[in-house]
Amino acid sequence: MNRRKSREVAMRLLFQTTLNGENLEEALENLKDVRESEDKEKDYESVDLKDVDIDYVKRIIKGIEKNKEEIDGKIKGNLKNWKIERLSKVDLSILRLCTYELKFEEDIPKRVSVNEAIELAKKYSGEKSATFINGVLGKMI
């Protein structure tokens, strides 16, 4: 199983639910259905779902949902001249994912989590966002 791909899927699910208010349980169930079907939905075309650790994705998503206030508080405390409400939904999803890993996933080296977040930002948000996310997360470690 590939942690990088699993993180990417988790970030996409977070983004999806943040953007359209979809229930996380429904999003996870949809992911499971897509993974088991032969035809891939557009949302997941660039990720081979066979390599995704669904249990890890579920743990991350449920952990973020359970600790959302604490995670958002940590993010807010490390934003300089920004409000969390002004962040793009992609950047917020990446920050929530990495903040959760930094705080609750002790088996993952902090630098690995931050580097993965930066790579997600480069892929889904852009170079400026990657620099911004690096700065915010750098204050947390």
Curated annotation (Swiss-Prot):
GO terms for biological process: DNA-templated transcription termination; transcription antitermination. Keywords: RNA-binding, Transcription, Transcription antitermination, Transcription regulation. GO terms for molecular function: RNA binding. The keyword Zinc does not apply. InterPro entries: NusB-like_sf, NusB_fam, NusB_RsmB_TIM44. It holds the Pfam family NusB. GO terms for cellular component: cytosol. SUPFAM superfamilies: NusB-like. PANTHER family: ANTITERMINATION NUSB DOMAIN-CONTAINING PROTEIN, N UTILIZATION SUBSTANCE PROTEIN B-RELATED. Belongs to the NusB family. Involved in transcription antitermination. Required for transcription of ribosomal RNA (rRNA) genes. Binds specifically to the boxA antiterminator sequence of the ribosomal RNA (rrn) operons. This is Transcription antitermination protein NusB. It comes from Clostridium botulinum (strain Loch Maree / Type A3).
